[in-house]
């Protein structure tokens, strides 16, 4: 503390050379010890004033602090977590169980800790657009782990409309032969005469029409298939026309029409028509023997 020694030696009239060798400078031998004692006392007072006085009540885990937590709700949170304003001002939170001033000089303010991504201060410092989901149609930025191919979902495939399956023709397929009207009439006349031609007949007939034997053979095959389809259609029409049509009044009757019941009904109708004062026309009766089978039997076959 050289500056302090110079400041105290000037008012007391002590020279630097004399004080270095311990010789008094014209003031007597009794003034040097008193000046040194005063200087030491002043230095001790300055050091004591510079050291922070740590009271046991300020420690977070002292008995007084724990007792004060039970008395005052919310005191524990305020003692453990420093306020955001203190951190913003440059003050650093001391570790638990370590007195303040033991980690460094009390006068030099320590640098604030960097805020983590998931700490309370870090979440409060985030911008609003990071906390609120963006409503813009732009694609949000992805984190690095989402951009890796292992975690990113596969891109959506665009479903293309199914291609229309067309009939595949042979590459060596010959074009269809355009028959003339005279050729078609001659082929039809020959088909009506004979549906199957021998090899000699086919060769002679094809040469007369200026056609190949293969063309005549294929035409006869197609014509026979067409004739078969027409014949089956005619048979189906005949079967539909041959089905009997039942009268609507005969549903639910199990006795044969034209039997004794029909005769009795006809007799009763004739008597009923002649008995009254006014002549009434008799109801027409179905001829006897028209339907000889049971009605129920016919209905069974219709269903």
UniProtKB/Swiss-Prot annotation:
Feature: compositional bias, Basic and acidic residues = 133-142
- Disease affiliated with this protein: Tooth agenesis, selective, 1: A form of selective tooth agenesis, a common anomaly characterized by the congenital absence of one or more teeth. Selective tooth agenesis without associated systemic disorders has sometimes been divided into 2 types: oligodontia, defined as agenesis of 6 or more permanent teeth, and hypodontia, defined as agenesis of less than 6 teeth. The number in both cases does not include absence of third molars (wisdom teeth). STHAG1 can be associated with orofacial cleft in some patients. MSX1 is deleted in some patients with Wolf-Hirschhorn syndrome (WHS). WHS results from sub-telomeric deletions in the short arm of chromosome 4.
Subunit architecture: Interacts with CREBBP/CBP, TBP and SP1; interaction with these transcription activators may inhibit autoinactivation. Interacts (via C-terminus) with PIAS1 (via N-terminus); the interaction is required for the localization of both proteins to the nuclear periphery and specific binding of MSX1 to the core enhancer region in target gene promoters. Interacts with H1-5.
Query: Where does this one sit in the cell?
Result: Nucleus
Q: List residues annotated as DNA-binding.
A: 172-231
Q: What is the effect of changing residue 84 to V?
A: In OFC5; cleft palate only
Keyword hit for Ubl conjugation: yes
> Which residue ranges have biased composition labelled Low complexity?
31-44
Q: What is its main location?
A: nucleus
Which keywords appear in this protein's UniProt record, sorted alphabetically? Developmental protein, Disease variant, DNA-binding, Ectodermal dysplasia, Homeobox, Isopeptide bond, Nucleus, Repressor, Transcription, Transcription regulation, Ubl conjugation
Q: What Gene3D superfamilies does the record point to?
A: Homeodomain-like
Q: Which family does it belong to?
A: Belongs to the Msh homeobox family.
Task: Give me the ranges of the annotated region Disordered.
Answer: 18-55, 69-117, 133-174
Q: Which GO terms describe its cellular component?
A: chromatin; nuclear periphery; nucleoplasm; nucleus; transcription regulator complex
PTMs per UniProt:
Sumoylated by PIAS1, desumoylated by SENP1. Sumoylation of Lys-15 and Lys-133 not required for interaction with H1-5, transcriptional repression, inhibition of myoblast differentiation, or binding to gene promoters.
Identification of the protein by name: Homeobox protein MSX-1
Residues in cross-link Glycyl lysine isopeptide (Lys-Gly) (interchain with G-Cter in SUMO)? 15, 133
The family database entries (InterPro entries) matched by this protein are listed as: HD (IPR001356), HD_metazoa (IPR020479), Homeobox_CS (IPR017970), Homeodomain-like_sf (IPR009057), Msh_Homeobox_Regulators (IPR050674)
Describe the task this protein carries out.
Acts as a transcriptional repressor. Capable of transcription autoinactivation. Binds to the consensus sequence 5'-C/GTAAT-3' in downstream activin regulatory elements (DARE) in the gene promoter, thereby repressing the transcription of CGA/alpha-GSU and GNRHR. Represses transcription of myoblast differentiation factors. Binds to core enhancer regions in target gene promoters of myoblast differentiation factors with binding specificity facilitated by interaction with PIAS1.
Give the source species. Homo sapiens (Human)
Q: Report the GO molecular function annotations.
A: cis-regulatory region sequence-specific DNA binding; DNA-binding transcription activator activity, RNA polymerase II-specific; DNA-binding transcription factor activity, RNA polymerase II-specific; DNA-binding transcription repressor activity, RNA polymerase II-specific; p53 binding; RNA polymerase II transcription regulatory region sequence-specific DNA binding; sequence-specific double-stranded DNA binding; transcription cis-regulatory region binding
| Result when mutating residue 157 to S | In OFC5; unilateral cleft palate
Which Gene Ontology BP terms does the record give? activation of meiosis; anterior/posterior pattern specification; BMP signaling pathway; bone morphogenesis; cardiac conduction system development; cartilage morphogenesis; cell morphogenesis; cell surface receptor signaling pathway involved in heart development
